Design a protein with these regions (language model features):
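Positively charged, polyanion-binding regions of nucleic-acid-associated proteins
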Residues: 1-3
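Contiguous, well-ordered alpha-helical segments that form the cores/surfaces of helical PPI scaffolds
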Residues: 231-245
């Protein structure tokens, strides 16, 4: 009875059985058995859905998503209301999932990188952790970047993202990140290994521009000549001091 997707036919069939039970003088017994059956049915469905995984086309990674159905048509969940009738809620009409958690080495604050499929290609956006935990905060940053989130489905999207993060601690283990140049322990940014930049996007190009280029030996020989001038030598010392000092 409950496996059918046609709610009208489902209701008609239950009413027919109820009338037959009433004619037999066992309506109350039928109602009790039906309630118990529906409760068991719902629990079984929840158990079956608890191990679901994301199934997006060309997804960057596969995650456990609990009771959410995460497919190319969007993210949704079926729940049963107070009358034990199935209801569907939609968290997002297109694929989206957390793919990376960045933990700032200076502040210990976390940011979450979300991947979402729009216009036939996967795109990414990184937001503060509290944005993904608040239905009011999540709408602005995500919607202006193309994610279909509104005040109506925001709370469901927050629940979905929270479930994905909570169910995948190994796949989404926080990675160290930094938003500045300079020393980080015994390593110096931007040359440190396995540390991500997660600062203001407007300064990322400047951050990436600091890199090794040219011939060190030629530079060294030329600077050796320039350092014969005391003023130039002082300028060299001043420019290097911020790097030398932690």
């Amino acid at each position: 009875i409950l496996e059918t997707d046609d709610l009208v036919e489902q209701r008609k069939f239950i009413e027919r059985l109820h009338n037959m039970a009433r004619d037999a003088g066992r309506a109350r017994e039928f109602d009790g058995v039906l309630r118990a059956f529906i409760t068991d049915f719902i629990q079984e469905k929840k158990q079956q859905a608890s191990d679901q995984k994301t199934r997006f086309f060309d997804q960057p990674m596969e995650l456990f998503c609990g009771q959410w159905r995460a497919e190319d048509t969007g993210i949704s969940m079926v729940y049963y209301d107070s009358k034990n009738m199935p209801q569907t809620i939609c968290a997002c009409p297109h694929p989206i999932l957390p793919v990376e958690i960045l933990k700032n080495v200076d502040t210990n604050e976390e940011r979450i990188c979300l991947a979402y499929l729009k216009y036939g290609e996967w795109q990414r956006i990184t937001v503060d952790r509290d944005v993904c935990a608040d239905a009011k905060k999540i709408v602005g940053p995500l919607s202006k970047n193309g994610v279909e989130v509104t005040s109506e489905n925001a709370k469901y999207l927050v629940r979905y993202l929270s479930d994905c993060i909570g169910l995948n601690p190994a796949a989404l283990k926080p990675k160290p990140s930094i938003n500045r140049l300079g020393w980080m322990g015994q390593q110096f940014m931007p040359y440190a290994q396995d540390i991500r930049y997660e600062g203001d996007p407007n300064f990322e190009s400047s951050f990436r521009a600091v890199c090794e280029k040219g011939d060190y030996q030629i530079w060294k020989e030329h600077c050796h000549i320039l350092r014969e001038n005391k003023v130039v030598r002082m300028a060299f010392a001043a420019s290097a001091s911020s790097v030398i000092l932690e």
